[in-house]
Amino acid sequence: MNKLNFDISSFDAFFKSVNFYLIKCGYKISFLDNKRPWGGFFAIDESQSQKFSNQFFDGKKIDNFRIAGKLSPKILLIKPKTRLSWQYHLRREEIWRVFFGKVGVIKNNSNNQQKILFLKEGDQEKIKTEERHRLIGIDNFAIVSEIWQHTDNENPSNEEDIVRVEDDFGREI
């Protein structure tokens, strides 16, 4: 166990301990997925966006995050030594903040992946619409808090709003 009492003995144990932590903090989990090849995620009820920001983004007012409508808070769990797709989105921007552990990030406006930026707990990164990006698990499990900033009020982003440029797991590009 560690200072936040997350069990890092296996991914299943880690996922369960984060689930318990989120419920203990009073979050309503609208959807969860522990079957992603890189880890998994918890989608938090959008009505709790300010509560989420208070805890995971230093209490910033959610109105300062809004672009064109709703916000969607999520918790990403990243397995060690895995890479999410090199990808971009057409209908959202994202704000990431490392809550637990360390991750790598690659981002730029072209399809060329460049150097890795290493982020530690408390570090934050902004992803613009159509900006290529990838999260990378380093040596241990990590938690990244994320807020989707929807850019199209009439057609909010969803899990299908992913344009994959490269994928380590053979998913469709």
Over which residues does each language-model region extend?
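Double-stranded beta-helix
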Residues: 2, 136-173
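Structural motif
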Residues: 102, 132, 141-143
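Glycine- and acidic-residue-biased ligand/ion/polar-headgroup-sensing regions
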Residues: 80, 90-110
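Conserved hydrophobic/aromatic beta-strand scaffold that supports enzyme active sites
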Residues: 73-77, 95, 116, 124-126
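Short acidic-glycine-tyrosine-enriched beta hairpin
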Residues: 109-133
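A short, N-terminal "cap"/entry segment at the start of jelly-roll beta-barrel domains
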Residues: 1-71, 117, 162-164, 169-173
